[in-house]
Amino acid sequence: ATAAFAENAKFDDGTILADEGSYDLVVYGDSSGAVTAAVAAKRKGLSVILINPTGFLGGMSASGLGATDFLGQRRTFGGIASEFYEGINASYGEKHVRSFEPHVGEQVFKKLIADAQVQVLFDEKLNRETGVEMDGNRIVSITTLSGKTFHGKMFIDATYVGDLMAAAGVSYTVGREPESQYGEDLAGVRRGDTRPRLHYGQGDKDHFVAEVDGYVIPGD
């Protein structure tokens, strides 16, 4: 795979900036998932570019959502997620930090990217109208609003809204699927479900307790 680098394209923190080219993996997004996917693939030896539609890394975790739904089981963290929290701990000089400031989270994400030498392009939004080239049901390349084109063997949509998937014609559902679609007894709308969950102890707070239905045909 080849990649054309922009001149002097490197942040002070070591983040490598990139330009158009062909890659094993093209990751589109700015979320924590975008960072971890790009880092994991790069560590596996793939050529990777992270196309970031905004000017910062880390999505909500670097934008104010610095509290973690952590229930006391340290073993639930592993892999790059564990490395992220190790970086948070090191930043504060403490152990077991689970709430952090946005700028600290962003710096840890940047370090993960820089250490893995992942190439990043900031402020490049997908052209959702004509920017996805397909070969059958496979994405061949994507083009941004600025006109830059990126070819890849694989693509990952790591946005929160699924812009790349939608532009590629991937089917999707808005809201919850009915229980019958995939045979999931916990799918669909839940009403008055009070089955105990040990980590809450007061019933299932993830389910609706009022009769809320998001479909035109109730119960669909």
Where are these regions (language model features)?
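Glycine-rich FAD pyrophosphate-binding loop
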Residues: 42-62
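Aromatic-residue-lined binding/catalytic grooves and analogous aromatic/hydrophobic interfacial grooves
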Residues: 9, 14-15, 45, 69-220
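Active-site-proximal beta-strand/loop segments in catalytic clefts of secreted hydrolases
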Residues: 28-31, 51-54, 65, 123-125, ...
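N-terminal export signals
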Residues: 1-6
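Beta1/beta-strand and adjacent pyrophosphate-binding region of the FAD-binding site
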Residues: 17-31
